[in-house]
From Swiss-Prot:
Naturally occurring in which organism (per UniProt): Cronobacter sakazakii (strain ATCC BAA-894) (Enterobacter sakazakii)
Protein's name according to its UniProt entry: ATP synthase epsilon chain
Source organism phylogeny: Bacteria, Pseudomonadati, Pseudomonadota, Gammaproteobacteria, Enterobacterales
Recorded superkingdom: Bacteria
Record flagged with keyword Cell membrane: yes
Entries under PANTHER family matching the protein: ATP SYNTHASE DELTA/EPSILON CHAIN (PTHR13822), ATP SYNTHASE EPSILON CHAIN, CHLOROPLASTIC (PTHR13822:SF10)
Gene field: atpC
Keyword Cytoplasm belongs to the record: no
Cited function: Produces ATP from ADP in the presence of a proton gradient across the membrane.
Assembly and interaction partners: F-type ATPases have 2 components, CF(1) - the catalytic core - and CF(0) - the membrane proton channel. CF(1) has five subunits: alpha(3), beta(3), gamma(1), delta(1), epsilon(1). CF(0) has three main subunits: a, b and c.
Pfam families (UniProt xref): ATP-synt_DE (PF00401), ATP-synt_DE_N (PF02823)
Family to which this protein belongs: Belongs to the ATPase epsilon chain family.
Length: 139
């Protein structure tokens, strides 16, 4: 039997996941993180993107995170997300529209374009689409 640890994924609205997992993958402020059982204690900001949860017996779940904090303690990992949405709950049409709008905003020739904000919106839309794609494959 594979080693596991307890994971809690919590957003401001509700608890998204609580249970035993074999590992997770998430994007931290310094890059991609793979958290396995026995990982050293860690506290880091997480970037907008997804968390890949590998539950017992290799079953996978994907959750979109708009950002937040990851805390790793012995035997327990907590993700405090600003917003968390399960892959199956994401609306693909809305994500595609958000991506299109962000791309249009970036291409806009207006002088008042905030490229940092437009780029952040584009990254969020792309992350949502990736979560949708991976969730479909996992089903």
């Amino acid at each position: 039997m594979a080693m596991t640890y307890h994971l809690d994924v919590v957003s401001a609205e509700k608890q998204m996941f609580s249970g035993l997992v074999e590992k997770i993958q998430v994007t931290g402020s310094e890059g991609e993180l793979g958290i396995y059982p026995g990982h050293a204690p860690l506290l880091t900001a997480i970037k907008p993107g997804m968390i890949r949860i590998v539950k017992q017996h290799g079953h996978e779940e994907y959750i979109y995170l708009s950002g937040g904090v990851l805390e790793v303690q012995p035997g327990n990992v907590t993700v405090l997300a600003d917003t968390a949405i399960r892959g199956q709950d994401l609306d693909e049409a809305r994500a595609l529209e958000a991506k299109r709008k962000a791309e249009d905003h970036i291409r806009s020739s207006h002088g008042d374009v905030d490229y940092a904000q437009a780029s952040a919106e584009l990254a969020k839309a792309i992350a949502k689409l990736r979560v949708i794609e991976l969730t479909k494959k996992a089903m």
